Every structure is written in structure tokens, then in C-alpha cells.
Amino acid sequence: MATDIFNSKNLAVQAQKKILGKMASSKYIATSLIDDTSGEVLDELYQVTREYTQNKKDAEKITKNLIKTVIKLAVLYRNNQFNEEEIGLMEKFKRKVHQLAMTVVSFYQVEYTFDRNVLSKLLNECRELLHQVIQRHLTAKSHGRVNNVFDHFSNCEFLAALYNPFGPYKKHLQRLCNGVNKMLDEDNI
């Protein structure tokens, strides 16, 4: 005899994750779910990724994967799906992302302080914490999306190109850091 237990709340969360994951594929719908400043930061990340990779499809995939991950994480968080240990990991993840954001801006604002290894290490620490937070909740495909995003942004060559003061991405970095700084000021990261 099957012991399947129907739980409407779990079903609703699964549906939300699925629907919002699909909706994140549409730029129009994704921007309606994300505030203006975050949208501007995501647009800059897309632009610099597209120019760096010289591949529109890869840049779109990385950006979509980032948006889908953020939306699914928000759905889980808002629906109280995390146990006590995961809540602790989530808080640690949020602090690490805040530290990363402050470091990104600091490296831009203070000349000769940029260290690609420091940024790459922080990004990889965020990745590991995120995997731990979502381990029980999201599929292997979602974990692959996380890796796709972090593999790109933690790449030391990408970071060096982005922060090169004489490189082609200087304006992108400026707009990116202005947006991240605004998110920090608004306590949004």
C-alpha cells in the first residue's frame, strides 16, 4: 500500500518554483519580479558577459540561470521551506554576498587594491554556501545552473579583464559598481 502523503503547501511551493523558473526566461516578466536597481545590475552583468564571451547565447544563459536561481531561492525563503540549519546557512550566505558586494565596490573605488584571487575565492565561498542551502530543495539541474553562473563570474581571467583600468569593460564596471553600491545603500544586498 502506498504511503503517499498529499501536502498542498509543498505542491504550491513546487508550482511556484516551476512557474517562476519558466517566467524568468522572459525578460519582461523577470524585470517585473526584480526591482529597478537589481535589473540595472543584471543588465550590466549581461552586457559585460556578452562582450567578454562574444557569445550572446552564453551570456543569456548565464543571466537567465542567475535570475532563475535568485527567484527560486526567494520562493523557498518566503514560503518558510528552510529548516533551522538551512536558515543559519542562508544567513551566512547573505553575509558572504554582502561582503562580496562591498569588496567588488571597494576594489573599484580604491586604486591598486584589486585582487582577482580574493574575488574568485569569495564567489566560490558563496557558491558552496548556496549549494548547501538549496541541497534539499532544488534539482541537480538547478545546482548545474548555480555552477554555470559561478563558473563564469569567478573566472580569474574574466575578473582581471573586468577590472583592467585600461580595458574595454571600464564603463560596465563603473555602472555595475554604482548599481551594487546603490543596492548596499538600500540594504538590498
Swiss-Prot record:
The keyword Nucleotidyltransferase does not apply. It comes from Xenopus laevis. PANTHER family: TUMOR NECROSIS FACTOR ALPHA-INDUCED PROTEIN 8, TUMOR NECROSIS FACTOR INDUCED PROTEIN. This is Tumor necrosis factor alpha-induced protein 8. GO terms for cellular component: cytoplasm. It comes from the Eukaryota. The keyword Metal-binding does not apply. One of its GO terms (molecular function) is cysteine-type endopeptidase inhibitor activity involved in apoptotic process. The gene is tnfaip8. It is found in: Cytoplasm.
